[in-house]
């Protein structure tokens, strides 16, 4: 196993992760409804997002929360997303950057869930 070092590593974990997502019984249908056809534009955007988040490389443009706000997702969906994400990272990588990547994903998921719950008038029920 190795550290996450560059865009090649990012592409590996992003592509494998979203294959798992598409085939997952809980979160797969949510993603497949939103992205019914060609996934490459989404994958390219996620490559750029993680490259910016982890290595400060410019190139990501977008508002990730705005894309998730209209979806019917809850804590169970976020927990499953994180489970698949962590599993993917752990299958290929170790070290500081692997842990940092998982921590960033967890922070982002928690923020998204909290904002969605506030939008829906729910109390904060973060489960992670």
Feature locations, PLM:
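Core of compact, soluble alpha-helical bundle domains
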Residues: 1-128
């Amino acid at each position: 196993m190795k550290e996450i070092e560059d865009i090649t590593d990012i592409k590996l974990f992003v592509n494998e992760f979203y294959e798992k997502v598409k085939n997952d019984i809980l979160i797969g249908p949510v993603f497949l409804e939103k992205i019914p056809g060609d996934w490459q534009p989404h994958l390219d955007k996620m490559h750029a997002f993680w490259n910016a988040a982890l290595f400060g490389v410019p190139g990501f443009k977008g508002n990730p929360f705005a894309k998730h706000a209209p979806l019917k997702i809850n804590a169970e969906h976020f927990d499953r997303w994180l489970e698949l994400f962590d599993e993917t990272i752990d299958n290929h990588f170790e070290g500081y950057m692997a842990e940092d990547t998982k921590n960033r994903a967890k922070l982002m998921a928690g923020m998204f869930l909290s904002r969605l719950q506030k939008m829906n008038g729910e109390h904060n029920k973060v489960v992670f």
